[in-house]
From Swiss-Prot:
Protein name: Uridine 5'-monophosphate transferase
Enzyme class: transferase
Name of the gene encoding the protein in the UniProt record: xopAC
Enzyme Commission number(s) from the entry: 2.7.7.-
Domain remark text: The LRR domain, the Fic/Fido domain and the uridylylation activity are required for avirulence function on Col-0.
The LRR repeat ranges on this chain: 140-164, 165-189, 191-211, 212-234, 236-257, 258-282
Residue ranges, compositional bias (Polar residues): 31-45, 66-84
Annotated InterPro entries: Fido, Fido-like_dom_sf, Leu-rich_rpt_typical-subtyp, LRR-SigEffector_domain, LRR_dom_sf, RLCK_Uridylyltransferase
Stretches for region Disordered: 22-84
Amino acid sequence: MDKNLNLWDMSTFIQQYGALTADHPTHTPEDSPQTVPSPRSSSAHSPEIQELRSLQETRPARLGARSQSRSSKHGLQQCSSSPSDESFRLHAELAAWCERVETKPSLLAKLGCCAAPPVVGDHREQRREAMERIMRCLDAGQAGTQLTLRDLNLSQLPPGLHRLAHLRDLDVADNVNLTRLPEDLSLCKHLERINADGCSIAALPSKIGALKNLSEISLAFNELRTLPDSIGQCSSLTTIVVPGCKINKLPASLANLTQLKKLDVAANIELSELSPHMNLDDVAVHSTQTRLGLMHRIFKAPTFDPETRQRLSYQASALRDRWAALSHHLSPQARARVDQMREGASTTLSSQDHKASTAWKTATEKVSSWAEEGAPITLDRIFKLNQLLLPEGDDDNDPIGGQLRKVGIQAAPSNTWTECRYPPPETLKDEMAKFSGWLEHSEQQAHARDALGHIEFAAQLHQRLVSLHPFDDANGRTARLAMDWALQRHGLPPAPPVGEASRLPASFLGGKRVSPEKVVLETLEGIATVMNQVHQ
């Protein structure tokens, strides 16, 4: 068969294979001539051939609908396609696409024009349904902004999607045999949202960067190992959702996406790096079940304008001087009120848990002795604090103190598995190493800090420990005792939490961020509250 046969040119088709309607004479046993339909004749009435004829007959009428304009200067005629002609072209492309996977082998397949269709998965591909939806979208004109091809068991996307001039939203999710998004998808210039969750996509168009209006792309649970470099050219992109894939590397070009607000790469267990040039200040990164250690990149030192810093510095110095005058003459009742305020920040201590209360008192005494000695705050001592707060018990299920957690956890109350998740356990070793480096550097600068500087360090220490949540339990109590240690070592009183920022100072990669300035201000307020309690 001629492989270059134009399936839509019926004259060529007939010349190649003969008239499909011709009847061939034959003879009965009595040698009486009869006419019986040939196999080709019977096939001529199949839906496929009828559609071919219909297209061939309507083509001249459609082509005649073209609008023409003549240039008098050059004597040349220019033709532009009318909507009806565009519809014909798209219909022809889709009809040919459908021919390749009919439920029954088509006549063209019998003749060798295309292979007989395999069954894809447990069901046939619903290409006819996809074709009808596309044509309805085209016929809708400006209202045809959405196209849903979800769960049609497609192994490839239909051709001609770029002919849908008003397409904004494309949903091809749950086509489990779909392995790639075609290159010509980058021609859909007005596309804003793509949902291809739950497929088997291993490759995106290399020129996807041409989609300048694309704002959201969701490719959860696919076979992707990376994203094309050109995605960094999608200047309107705000959301990238690719959890549950096989991504082990992300392009550095993501740093160019200045509008990006959400990057969900959860459950890509081989992913360990993100471009250092990517600004995470305004990007929520969902990194559960990855090896991405990014918390050190969202921790910031507090910054105040000169006027505010001068005012706060004066206030901090005044509080330190007042505490120095009062701390050696506190009555037992005043000390009890301060301790009650500190314990009230913990739901565990507030629940009258005798074992936890005893451990808290032991750890508090240890912090006081370290503060009096002027002992530097180190990572080893913070681990020791957590161990004191979680003494070994008789129950094998009790959390073990002083060890990094090995499970993923989230803040409570929370109804999301990404937005309020603490760092993955796979990243904690590296995260704590970076935290230890920050501690050492801060300790070296301690002699140069004023009272406000000591409060800023204590507030950051509290926030960073709570945000990392490195232990199985007692993370909040460990962080508060570490903060009190940092304050008491420099002649300041403990600072019980008094506001939302100081009670819940954690910042999350995937969601809420608490400014360090707010934590510092509420730490100052907590110190002032202690002073008021002492005066009563």
